[in-house]
Amino acid sequence: MTIAFQLAVFALIATSSILLISVPVVFSSPDGWSSNKNVVFSGTSLWIGLVFLVGILNSLIS
């Protein structure tokens, strides 16, 4: 169970880092938002899901 928690935290950190870089790039490009809207929404949905997963796994470990 600890391995799953550590992998979930790593995935959350990696997703946060990717979104931290990619979202401003998408917003600053001229046609970026209209062409990459689905990618931003799916990345945000993945991030929210990982936040809940880390919270659930944390409550099971503690």
From Swiss-Prot:
Keyword Phosphoprotein listed: no
Biological process, per Gene Ontology: photosynthesis; photosystem II stabilization
Subcellular location: Plastid, Chloroplast thylakoid membrane
NCBIfam families, per the entry: PS_II_psbZ
Membrane topology annotation: Multi-pass membrane protein
Official protein name in the record: Photosystem II reaction center protein Z
The organism's taxonomic lineage, starting at the top: Eukaryota, Viridiplantae, Streptophyta, Embryophyta, Tracheophyta
Signal peptide: none
Residue spans crossing the bilayer: 8-28, 41-61
Domain of life (superkingdom): Eukaryota
